[in-house]
Amino acid sequence: MIITSERISLKHLLTAEALTDREVMGLIRRAGEFKQGAKWHPEERQYFATNLFFENSTRTHKSFEVAEKKLGLEVIEFEASRSSVQKGETLYDTVLTMSAIGVDVAVIRHGKENYYDELIQSKTIQCSIINGGDGSGQHPTQCLLDLMTIYEEFGGFEGLKVAIVGDITHSRVAKSNMQLLNRLGAEIYFSGPEEWYDHQFDVYGQYVPLDEIVEKVDVMMLLRVQHERHDGKESFSKEGYHLEYGLTNERATRLQKHAIIMHPAPVNRDVELADELVESLQSRIVAQMSNGVFMRMAILEAILHGKA
């Protein structure tokens, strides 16, 4: 049975924390409907979407593309390496162009934090913006698909014990997740190299050694070591990191039977978690990827519903 959810309308999706609890739950339920086979196709007019990715991406980029095509949108292709960006065109002018030619929604990933500020302040740019990741800032669509995956497993968030482990300071996924999970009633634990942890995050949870929480958590959320944001200054070997901060096979045996393993991917196998655990029975990494399509369908629908 498909349960009908309240329709959500959004102008933009820039940060996770800007969403209300009603919007979060509405998007989760609508994504679940899409997963069960619900259909939506634009009526009366054609809608155009474009994916402007200035940082490398597989999952976010391609799952948005699949989501757009499942919804019947016209997808305007864009490759930064073959665009006027190579001639010095700014992000603002690229988006201005897309808006001028009739694009309704632009999914953007960019290395600059808060890149979207000047775009949404523009009186000329009319297209909606979905943040596909801004530097080390936010990744709201990844957060929402993570919440969907957790909700499918546990039916709620109140009282869940969630460990966020790894390169927390550099992780936009961690920032978005800690904000919403904390607000929805989950109990957050942070772990990983202390030099990769900022104590400003203490408002959302507590920092503890990994071995103190392995047996306690319901969700083990591991983060990719972001080598590209360390300028080659990591102080750990891959083997050393895995033994001290990774989910080893030995640590995995200490997880509760109902606990799930999550990772936003790409996974550095045998670094953040043991190779054998990526597709293990407790892993939900593949489910996260699959849910990404349905959640992004729900987000796109909410954006276009706001334009109707």
From Swiss-Prot:
Any one GO CC term of the record: cytosol
Biological-process GO terms, alphabetical? 'de novo' pyrimidine nucleobase biosynthetic process; 'de novo' UMP biosynthetic process; amino acid metabolic process
Q: Gene3D superfamilies under this entry?
A: Aspartate/ornithine carbamoyltransferase
Q: What is its EC number?
A: 2.1.3.2
Q: Which parts of the chain span the membrane according to its record?
A: none
Question: What GO annotations for molecular function exist for this entry?
Answer: amino acid binding; aspartate carbamoyltransferase activity
Protein transport as a keyword? no
The UniProt keyword set, sorted, is:
Pyrimidine biosynthesis, Transferase
- Organism's domain of life? Bacteria
Q: Which reaction does it catalyse?
A: carbamoyl phosphate + L-aspartate = N-carbamoyl-L-aspartate + phosphate + H(+)
Q: How does it assemble?
A: Heterododecamer (2C3:3R2) of six catalytic PyrB chains organized as two trimers (C3), and six regulatory PyrI chains organized as three dimers (R2).
Q: In UniProt terms, what function does this protein have?
A: Catalyzes the condensation of carbamoyl phosphate and aspartate to form carbamoyl aspartate and inorganic phosphate, the committed step in the de novo pyrimidine nucleotide biosynthesis pathway.
Q: Extract the HAMAP family matched here.
A: Asp_carb_tr (MF_00001)
Query: Could you tell me what this protein is called?
Result: Aspartate carbamoyltransferase catalytic subunit
Which organism is this entry from? Answer: Enterococcus faecalis (strain ATCC 700802 / V583)
Organism classification, top ranks?
Bacteria, Bacillati, Bacillota, Bacilli, Lactobacillales
**Gene behind this protein:** pyrB
